[in-house]
């Protein structure tokens, strides 16, 4: 009943959800125009964008550089930052793998953070390997390995990022350390 009630309360959100289910059928321009109207209730001004949101849509459509793909990849961007300003500004990486099953947990320290390289928000923090729930971590990360972040909002730099998992040094001072365990 919860989803049905949400759809009744906010029909635009229900339409947006249904629209995203057909996301592969639309050109980038068509998709962004329709999604923009659903979210903001007005037509997207592509020719002379004024608002921040319109300018972001314009950038998605017309400002494409191949280096952006390396910049959104959490593993590849470490190389760029190291080359440009030095490795002191990069959180140390313990490894990169194509699947969860390839991770060599015995070689990782007691505390670490696992992240997907190709999206935003898919991470798992391990504060103690003895208490680490590998099954839950695997379910969360592998679910996200099969998503292509590009399709939801047409942020094309994400389209060709190879989905992988990295292990990084756990840095509790960065952000909310208790948000995922």
Please provide the spans of the model-predicted regions:
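Short catalytic/ligand-binding loop motif for oxyanion handling, primarily in non-cytosolic enzymes
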Residues: 78, 101-104, 120-125, 134, ...
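Acidic/histidine-enriched active-site and ligand-binding environments that engage anionic O-linkages
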Residues: 103-114
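A short, GP-enriched loop/loop-strand-helix hinge that lies immediately N-terminal to
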Residues: 57-70, 132
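Membrane-proximal basic amphipathic "stem/tether" segments
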Residues: 1-63
């Amino acid at each position: 009943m919860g989803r049905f009630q949400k759809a009744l309360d906010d029909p635009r959100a229900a339409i947006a959800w249904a629209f995203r289910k057909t996301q592969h059928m639309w050109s980038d321009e068509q998709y962004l125009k329709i999604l923009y109207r659903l979210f903001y209730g007005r037509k997207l001004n592509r020719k002379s964008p004024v608002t921040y949101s319109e300018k972001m849509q314009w950038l998605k459509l017309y400002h494409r550089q191949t280096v952006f793909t390396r910049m959104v990849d959490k593993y590849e961007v470490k190389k760029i930052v190291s080359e440009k300003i030095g490795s002191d500004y990069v959180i140390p990486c313990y490894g990169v793998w194509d699947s969860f099953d390839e991770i060599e947990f015995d070689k990782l320290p007691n505390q670490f953070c696992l992240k997907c390289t190709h999206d935003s928000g898919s991470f798992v923090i391990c504060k103690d390997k003895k208490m680490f729930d590998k099954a839950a971590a695997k379910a969360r990360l592998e679910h996200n390995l099969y998503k292509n972040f590009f399709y939801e909002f047409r942020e094309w730099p994400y389209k060709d990022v190879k989905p992988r998992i990295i292990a990084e040094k756990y840095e509790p001072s960065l952000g909310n350390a208790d948000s995922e365990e």
